[in-house]
Design a protein with these regions (language model features):
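A beta-strand signature from Gram-negative outer-membrane beta-barrel systems
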Residues: 95, 106, 153, 162-204, ...
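Extracytoplasmic gating/loop element in the C-terminal half of outer-membrane beta-barrel translocons
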Residues: 456-458, 466-476, 886-981, 985
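Residues embedded in well-ordered regular secondary structure
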Residues: 118-125, 134-159, 197-334, 372, ...
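Extracytoplasmic beta-strand/coil segments of soluble accessory domains associated
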Residues: 101-136, 140, 167, 177-197
Length: 1024
């Protein structure tokens, strides 16, 4: 008994001494938080960096007090201010938070993950201030890793400047669909617009000047005029450019003009000396011409954007407003655009329980551009042998490209409006309810004008030769009289096409959130419930106005015969389309945390759509996601894991239900107008798709593992994601016996899988008061494979380069090629057939069996992408160098080989290596140029050259490394501005899309991606 009593007393002594030691190790930290102008800041979050349960906020006077361990570090954070970490002190602390507006850091973001759907394509979804904007197929997601990402995002969103964007977040895993539904299957780019923080009163002016360089032929696979004329002379010697052949084509170039001028007579002389010497002089001039169409059609101009913004904030209300204009005189000479925009982001808190918010975003733009002849396309498809001041034949009518740009153009007017209002009710720290409503409107009217002098209008009157009259489809010829002389249907004027597009979207979001902690903060629980609703209405259409005399007050002189020409040719002169998309979703989320280390998240979203009409069989689509997290940093043993400074991991699994490619849960009946060659008009109905009661939504199951860690006090930080996606019940062709008149209906018959790795790494190489060097590296790898497919694509589908093909056992968007053997002694291409035989023109493009002989060339989608950015700072100077890379994709080179060529065609550098004489087949794989005699001797020779275009030698890799951006910035020291009314002046000079460091030589100089102008951008930001 005595022993037990002694042990109890000893235990009490130990407990008391331990408690005393603990109390001795904690201190009461007190202080005050101010802004950069010395004003107190209320509601600043003050948190212990290690023990997050120790947390408080500043009062109305900016004061705080918190009991923490003696060696703790406190984190001070407030929206609109820079987050600050400060070691605790026993003395009263005075903390100053600087405005966060002055720094903009790029984020290391990987590209979007590949979706698992055979037929449906998903694109990144823009979400602005929590409201869905649209999917965007044109935005290059590789730009998200750029340090200049905000400027590129602003260029993609109407009415926003770079300064209007406060931050953006990229969501690529299954949580994207849990938040925004199946429309977010392609990933989400969530943009948050700027708003004023507390204690801010700032006026800012920003100007951005962009100088775009004129394109160069070094980036295009186009022969110069000397090499082009070498090909044309060989065609002439082979009998392919004779006058009787060239003059009656729909289009001609240098040879056609020479032959045409040789028979034109004026002022007692012919336009062209039709002698050998005269033709030689004419062709020699064309050979030396080397027209630079880029310089003819493009210009050196400066696009400038001006933005003024005003931000002000108090404890009760704050607002951010900006007004800006973008003036663009045009990269091409025919282009110009002016845009004006306004933004307002305001919040008001009249009571501690209630918060009201409103956002207004409006923009209006006017633009002028080329019409049927795009400047960049025309410059890259018009031969360099052509005289830019001369008229040539195009669709039986004369054409001068420079003059056509003046007579054939497009005018656009567009308006974009977004109104958003929100209300939040927070009666306690545990409960919060909010309601958000948004209305978005977009309207655009485009006028495509072809004046009476344009080539397009002159085609309606081209009938100066009998062969032209017989072949010109712009003339009217009665269907019941084969001997009738064609008639002009638009004898006067030109014509105009007016297109209009408008969309209206209404969104309503309701949320209720409950947050609580239990057992002294050991357990934390957050419950979220809500509903989303949107109503989207889209209207579009166009109509043609014929016989408009633009030079005499747009007088209308249409001919009634024109409507007969339209009707009998089964043509339309107007069309209208209306789309209604309605969706409602109910969602719930539960988050649980134990000791701030272990977490569980679960979410469920159930949404319905009107896409399937009255059918209820597949109206509702579920999406769910669960995740487990572990913050190893908070573990007691973590300090022993040196040099690790942070470590956390998360494992998630979820299923996303997505809309199928078709919506025929019930049969779909559509209207149509049967073609009648007479005046009878009899609308009809037809069965577009048979009913498929087994149709269900596509399912994507995703497993994702995330690992975040830091080394040596975050000098090195990394994030790693591994994911696996399984696509099931995918919609594709399901063959049947022709029941109901459909042999190839669509059904849930396919499946595929996708896997990937995403890595971002940031290293603080050098950190000092005067100099710092930071490196950010991003890498992503995405691969996929079709695991089940019922359809049987033929050869033409597999070798097509338009969108790639789906084939079981191979990646989606695959390209296959016909195996090339060698050239024959005549220079004709030869190929391997399915049975191993050598064929010239006997490859069956319609075959659906025995396809294993086709060579797998690769996929159109890159498998490996990323970027490398190095940022340097010395005093007030900053330098950034960004390199972008992409590997793993291929492309089919342009189909420019044929048994017949024309004098207006643009050819690539491959033709310099063409077969010219017997024996060349041993040194080159570029076929010869057939003569007219060879075409007569081998009637199927055209099939051989067509096959060559789809052979493996016409495949190039799209791997590239590009120096994307170099930027140099300078901030004028605040000490130098102390005696002025200015608070900050920031300058930045940037060069974008500089040059390729590496690309495949088979591209012959052409870019492996869509062309973007080389730009030099100067940005000046002045704050008051």
């Amino acid at each position: 008994m005595v022993t037990r009593l002694w042990n109890l007393i000893l235990g009490l002594i130990l407990v008391v001494s331990s408690a005393t030691a603990i109390c001795a190790q904690t201190i009461l930290v007190q202080g005050k938080v101010l802004d950069s102008r010395g004003a107190p800041l209320a509601k600043v979050s003050v948190t212990d960096k290690v023990d997050h349960s120790k947390h408080t906020t500043t009062d109305a006077e900016g004061k705080f007090s918190l009991q923490v361990a003696e060696q703790s570090t406190l984190i001070f954070s407030l929206t609109g201010k820079k987050t600050l970490e400060v070691a605790v002190s026993r003395d009263p602390m005075t903390i100053t938070l600087e405005d966060a507006e002055e720094t903009q850091k790029g984020a290391a973001v990987t590209t979007m993950r590949q979706t698992t759907s055979i037929q449906t394509k998903y694109y990144p979804l823009w979400v602005i201030d929590g409201v869905v904007y649209k999917q965007d197929k044109d935005f290059n997601t590789a730009d998200l890793a750029s340090p200049d990402a905000k400027r590129l995002i602003a260029a993609a969103l109407p009415g926003l400047s770079e300064r209007d964007i406060e931050s953006f977040t990229v969501i690529t895993d299954a949580s994207a669909t849990a938040l925004y539904g199946n429309q977010a299957t392609g990933g989400v780019i969530s943009v948050r617009t700027r708003h004023a923080g507390q204690g801010i009163n700032r006026f800012t002016y920003t100007t951005q000047l962009t100088y775009r360089l004129i394109p160069s032929y070094r980036e295009f696979n186009i022969l110069n005029s000397q090499d082009q004329m070498s090909v044309l002379k060989e065609l002439e010697q082979g009998g392919s450019l004779s006058p009787e052949t060239v003059l009656y084509q729909t289009r001609y170039g240098v040879y056609g003009l020479m032959y045409d001028n040789a028979i034109k007579y004026k002022n007692k002389q012919y336009y062209q000396d039709n002698t050998l010497e005269g033709q030689t002089r004419y062709l020699a001039a064309a050979e030396r011409r080397n027209t630079d169409w880029f310089k003819e059609l493009f210009q050196n101009s400066i696009r400038h954007q001006h933005t003024v913004s005003l931000a002000s904030g108090t404890q009760v209300s704050n607002f951010y407003a900006s007004l800006g204009a973008t003036i663009d005189p045009g990269w091409a000479k025919v282009q110009s655009e002016n845009t004006y925009f306004f933004n307002l982001n305001a919040s008001f808190k009249p009571h501690r329980y209630w918060t009201f918010g409103s956002i207004v975003n409006a923009s209006y733009s006017q633009s002028h551009d080329g019409g049927d002849f795009n400047s960049l396309t025309s410059a890259s498809t018009f031969s360099r042998t052509l005289d830019p001041n001369q008229y040539y034949l195009y669709e039986f009518a004369p054409l001068n490209l420079k003059e056509e740009m003046k007579q054939n153009y497009q005018d656009d007017d567009a308006i974009n409006l977004r109104l958003q209002a929100s209300i939040a009710y927070r009666p306690s720290q545990k409960f919060n309810a909010s309601l958000l409503g948004s209305i978005q409107y977009y309207g655009q009217i485009s006028e495509f004008i072809r004046t009476e002098k344009s080539n397009v209008s002159e085609r309606f009157r081209a009938m100066n030769k009998r062969l032209i009259r017989d072949r010109n489809s712009y003339l009217y010829k009665p269907a019941d009289d084969v001997y009738a002389v064609p008639k002009v249907v638009m004898p006067h004027g030109g014509y105009r096409t007016i297109q209009d597009f408008s969309s209206r979207r209404f969104d309503l979001q309701a949320r209720a959130t409950y947050t609580d902690t239990f057992a002294d903060g050991k357990h934390a629980l957050t419950l979220v419930g809500g509903m989303d609703l949107f109503d989207y209405l889209e209207k579009s259409g166009w109509h043609d106005e014929y016989g408009v005399n633009f030079e005499i007050g747009e007088l209308s002189t249409f001919d009634p015969l024109l409507f007969k020409w339209l009707h009998e040719g089964n043509r339309k002169y107007y069309t209208r389309k209306t789309t209604i998309d309605r969706n409602v979703a109910f969602l719930g989320n539960a988050s649980y945390s134990f000791l701030g280390r272990y977490s569980f998240d679960g979410s469920l979203r159930y949404e319905g759509t009107n896409r399937f009409g009255k059918s209820r069989l597949v109206r509702w689509i579920p999406t769910w996601n669960v995740a487990l997290g572990w913050d190893v940093t908070s573990e007691a043993f973590f300090p022993s894991l040196s040099p690790l400074s942070s470590l956390s991991t998360k494992l998630s699994y979820g299923m996303t239900g997505t809309l199928p490619f078709v919506y025929n849960s019930y049969q779909r009946i559509k209207p149509f107008l049967p073609f009648r060659p007479n005046d009878l008009i009899e609308p009809g109905l037809y069965l577009s798709e048979p009913a498929n009661h087994d149709l269900t939504y596509e399912k994507m199951y995703e497993l994702n593992w995330n690992l975040n860690f830091g080394l040596w006090d975050e000098r090195i930080s990394a994030s790693l994601n591994l994911f696996s996606r399984q696509g099931r019940d995918l919609v594709d062709v399901a063959y049947n016996q022709g029941t109901g008149g459909f042999f190839k209906p669509y059904g849930n018959v396919a499946s595929m899988e996708a896997k990937g790795v995403e890595l971002s790494l940031t290293t603080q190489n050098i950190q000092s008061k005067l100099f710092s060097w930071t490196t950010t590296f991003s890498y992503s790898r995405n691969t996929n494979k079709v695991t089940k497919l019922n359809s049987h694509p033929d050869v033409s589908t597999l070798v097509s380069s338009s969108g790639g093909a789906a084939r079981e056992g191979y990646p989606l968007a695959s390209i296959f090629s016909i195996p090339f053997y060698k050239l024959s002694k005549e220079g004709f291409p030869l190929f391997y057939n399915y049975d191993g035989s050598i064929e010239r023109d006997n490859i069956n493009f319609s075959a659906t069996e025995n396809l294993d002989y086709l060579k797998y060339s690769g996929t159109l989608q890159p498998t490996d992408q990323g970027g490398l950015n190095n940022s340097f700072r010395w005093k007030n100077f900053s330098l950034s160098v960004y390199v972008l890379y992409s590997f793993g994709s291929v492309k089919r080179l342009p189909t420019q080989f044929s048994s017949s060529y024309y004098d207006y065609q643009v050819l690539g550098h491959e033709f310099n290596r063409r077969w010219r004489a017997p024996g060349d087949e041993e040194r080159t794989n570029v076929p010869s140029i057939p003569t007219s005699g060879q075409r007569n001797s081998y009637p199927n020779l055209s099939r051989a050259y067509s096959t060559y275009n789809y052979s493996d030698v016409r495949i190039a890799r799209c791997d590239y490394i590009q120096l994307r951006d170099i930027s140099l910035g300078y901030s004028i020291p605040k000490a130098a501005l102390a005696k002025t009314f200015l608070s900050s002046v920031d300058l930045k000079l940037q060069a974008s899309n500089l040059f390729l460091i590496y690309s495949d030589k088979k591209l012959n100089g052409a870019l492996p991606y869509a062309y973007s102008p080389h730009s030099i951008i100067f940005t000046c930001t002045v704050g008051i």
